[in-house]
């Protein structure tokens, strides 16, 4: 009996030892499982102290591993992941959940022929800056918006600096010189997002923001556009955007040497001017906001300056045998508007100190010969002044023509027609001037 009791005690001790060892092994396994790092996730069933420790560790590491998170990860699988150690769904902490959501909602990237581009998600408001730049004259002092493949290609070929380019079609992007867009932020958008700000009936597939170009920094290819003729166009207070754009387009088509614009002309980078000019801004030098002193300095000393007379009210009936009246003063022509000029600088001057353009011209102007536009009037470098339809030619324009022995070029019209549109008159005279210059064989085509 005693032997039997001793045997039972021995077996019980062994069982107790084995039981204790098994419990320790289970505790070790549980301890190891609890200490196991789960990247970015915490189980719901784990103790609060350990959860806080893991969250603090992953929070410290999240800033270092943001770049390792795959941008194409499915958002649903991130929001409701499953722990490998727990069949129940696990949860992110509030901070880490927001970080991951921000990463997955970021702009994704793509590539076209080695050119990286961003792909904006729908509803992105970055396109709103296009409307702000296009509608603000102050912002256009530094940036301009160009719309359409033709205009953007012309700007890039001339050396203009593109800052941001938006496109809605990969095929349209491939038509651009991609090698000139390596330093440009290229963004893919949906067509409907671009249509929100565009004023065109048919939205373009390419829209770009450029640093405002300067004529001195652009290059104009003679191989592509041909050699320019020695003919300079001067725009005197042309304020209609459509007219100015058409004038610039005619000047580019006629191969003019340059275009000079006085202060008071409409902004050449306004959208309506850009659309009407059809890329003329990047085919020849266009220099805006000049005083008449600046204009004189931009012209060769031997240049002869003529003015366009697109009105016929003072000439009566015209035919091929009509000889224009000569040696008339500028004030004799009704199309020269009655601008007023103040002879003194103070506001309290007597009203008699104000004189109209007509009075000024009667007293001070020399005679300005008038001739039909199709008779010879070019010799060497020639300049032509076109006035705006509202205000006509200024006093300074007439004085410059008189100083250089220029003439008034008359475009005859049938009775009952008062005048020609400024853009039409410019086109007629510029192409006539080109024809005469080429006929002199002073340049080669």
Swiss-Prot record:
Q: Where is the transit peptide?
A: 1-37
The transmembrane segments are none
Keyword annotations from UniProtKB, A to Z: Methyltransferase, Mitochondrion, rRNA processing, S-adenosyl-L-methionine, Transferase, Transit peptide
Q: What is the lineage of its organism?
A: Eukaryota, Metazoa, Chordata, Craniata, Vertebrata
EC number(s) for this protein? 2.1.1.-
Q: Does the keyword Methyltransferase apply?
A: yes
Q: Would you tell me the protein name for this molecule?
A: rRNA methyltransferase 3B, mitochondrial
Residues where S-adenosyl-L-methionine binds: 387, 411, 420
Under Gene Ontology molecular function, one entry of this record is: rRNA (uridine-2'-O-)-methyltransferase activity
Q: Name one GO cellular component term.
A: mitochondrion
Q: What does this protein do?
A: S-adenosyl-L-methionine-dependent 2'-O-ribose methyltransferase that catalyzes the formation of 2'-O-methylguanosine at position 1485 (Gm1485) in the mitochondrial large subunit ribosomal RNA (mtLSU rRNA), a conserved modification in the peptidyl transferase domain of the mtLSU rRNA. Also required for formation of 2'-O-methyluridine at position 1484 (Um1484) mediated by MRM2.
Family under the similarity heading: Belongs to the class IV-like SAM-binding methyltransferase superfamily. RNA methyltransferase TrmH family.
The coiled-coil segments of this chain are none
Q: Which InterPro entries match?
A: Alpha/beta_knot_MTases, Ribosomal_eL30-like_sf, rRNA_Methyltransferase, SpoU_MeTrfase, SpoU_subst-bd, tRNA_m1G_MTases_N
The record's catalysed reaction(s) read: a uridine in rRNA + S-adenosyl-L-methionine = a 2'-O-methyluridine in rRNA + S-adenosyl-L-homocysteine + H(+)
Q: Which organism is it from?
A: Danio rerio
């Amino acid at each position: 009996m005693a032997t039997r009791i001793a045997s039972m005690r021995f077996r019980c001790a062994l069982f107790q030892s084995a039981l204790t060892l098994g419990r320790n092994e289970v505790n070790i396994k549980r301890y190891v499982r609890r200490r196991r790092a789960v990247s970015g996730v915490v189980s719901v069933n784990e103790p609060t102290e350990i959860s806080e420790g893991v969250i603090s560790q992953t929070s410290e590491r999240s800033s270092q591993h943001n770049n390792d998170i795959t941008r194409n990860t499915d958002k649903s699988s991130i929001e409701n992941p499953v722990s490998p150690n727990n069949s129940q769904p696990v949860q992110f902490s509030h901070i880490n959940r927001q970080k991951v959501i921000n990463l997955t909602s970021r702009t994704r990237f793509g590539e076209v022929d080695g050119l990286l581009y961003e792909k904006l998600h729908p509803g992105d408001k970055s396109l709103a800056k296009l409307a702000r730049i296009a509608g603000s004259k102050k912002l256009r002092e530094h940036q301009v918006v160009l719309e359409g493949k033709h205009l953007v290609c012309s700007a890039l070929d001339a050396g203009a600096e593109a800052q941001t380019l938006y496109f809605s079609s990969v095929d349209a992007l491939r038509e651009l010189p991609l090698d000139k867009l390596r330093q440009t932020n290229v963004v893919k958008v949906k067509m409907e997002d671009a249509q929100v700000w565009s004023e065109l009936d048919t939205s373009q597939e390419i829209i770009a923001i450029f640093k405002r170009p300067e004529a001195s920094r652009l290059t104009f290819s003679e191989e592509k556009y041909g050699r320019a003729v020695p003919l300079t166009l001067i725009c005197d207070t042309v304020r209609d955007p459509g007219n100015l754009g058409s004038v610039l387009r005619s000047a580019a088509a006629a191969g003019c040497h340059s275009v000079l614009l006085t202060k008071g002309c409409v902004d050449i980078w306004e959208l309506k001017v850009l659309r009407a000019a059809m890329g003329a801004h990047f085919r020849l030098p266009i220099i805006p906001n000049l005083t008449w002193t600046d204009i004189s300095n931009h012209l060769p000393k031997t240049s002869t300056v003529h003015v366009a007379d697109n009105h016929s009210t003072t000439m009566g009936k015209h035919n091929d045998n009509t000889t224009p009246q000569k040696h008339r003063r500028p004030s004799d022509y009704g199309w020269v508007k009655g601008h007023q000029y103040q002879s003194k600088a103070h506001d309290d001057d007597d009203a008699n100190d104000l004189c109209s353009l007509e009075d000024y011209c009667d007293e001070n102007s020399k005679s300005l010969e008038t001739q039909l536009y199709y008779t010879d009037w070019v010799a060497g470098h020639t300049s032509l002044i076109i006035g705006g339809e509202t205000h006509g030619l200024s006093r300074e324009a007439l004085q410059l023509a008189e100083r250089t022995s220029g003439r008034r070029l008359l475009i005859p019209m049938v009775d009952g027609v008062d005048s020609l549109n400024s853009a039409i008159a410019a086109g007629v005279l510029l192409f006539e001037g080109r024809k005469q210059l080429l006929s002199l064989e002073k340049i080669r085509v």
